[in-house]
């Protein structure tokens, strides 16, 4: 099951040239850009691991592409995404986020039902990937 989070999530995977154009767009807007990765793809997992530090005041997309390549090399079977933050209003608001790397096999999610007091049923989804320990999920 293909994970659909962020901008461009329903499109085919972006090429490196397309990623560079998106990163260059963020740089031209003077947005801070960060690279994050995770092996827990749950939609509510908003705390991905940060690769290095966010890059502020970068003038050229090649520095960001270097960080992306380094992250891909170190974490080839992880989800990796690029985030761009706009602080012009005095807050760090994410204005662009897209996945740039995926594991070869995306196992998907299962629905878990739990009966609670009063015969109410609670539903939650869990990724099949989290059945394995962190760091060895893919």
Swiss-Prot record:
It comes from the Eukaryota. It is found in: Plastid, Chloroplast. CDD domains: RuBisCO_small (cd03527). InterPro entries: RuBisCO_ssu, RuBisCO_ssu_dom, RuBisCO_ssu_sf. RuBisCO catalyzes two reactions: the carboxylation of D-ribulose 1,5-bisphosphate, the primary event in carbon dioxide fixation, as well as the oxidative fragmentation of the pentose substrate in the photorespiration process. Both reactions occur simultaneously and in competition at the same active site. Although the small subunit is not catalytic it is essential for maximal activity. In this alga, in contrast to plants, the small subunit is encoded in the chloroplast. The basic functional RuBisCO is composed of a large chain homodimer in a 'head-to-tail' conformation. In form I RuBisCO this homodimer is arranged in a barrel-like tetramer with the small subunits forming a tetrameric 'cap' on each end of the 'barrel'. Heterohexadecamer of 8 large and 8 small subunits. This is Ribulose bisphosphate carboxylase small subunit. It comes from Porphyridium aerugineum (Red microalga).
């Amino acid at each position: 099951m293909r994970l659909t989070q962020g901008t461009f999530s329903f499109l085919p995977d972006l090429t490196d040239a397309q990623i560079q154009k998106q990163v260059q767009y963020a740089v031209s807007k003077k947005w801070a850009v960060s690279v994050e990765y995770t092996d827990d793809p749950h939609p509510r997992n908003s705390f991905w691991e940060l690769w290095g530090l966010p890059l502020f005041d970068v003038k050229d997309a090649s520095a960001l592409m270097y960080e992306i390549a380094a992250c891909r090399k170190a974490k080839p079977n992880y989800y990796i995404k690029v985030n761009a933050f706009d602080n012009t209003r005095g807050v760090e608001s994410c204005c662009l986020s897209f996945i740039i790397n995926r594991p070869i096999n995306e196992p998907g999610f299962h629905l878990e039902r739990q009966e609670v007091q009063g015969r109410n049923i609670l539903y939650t989804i869990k990724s099949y990937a989290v059945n394995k320990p962190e760091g060895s999920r893919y």
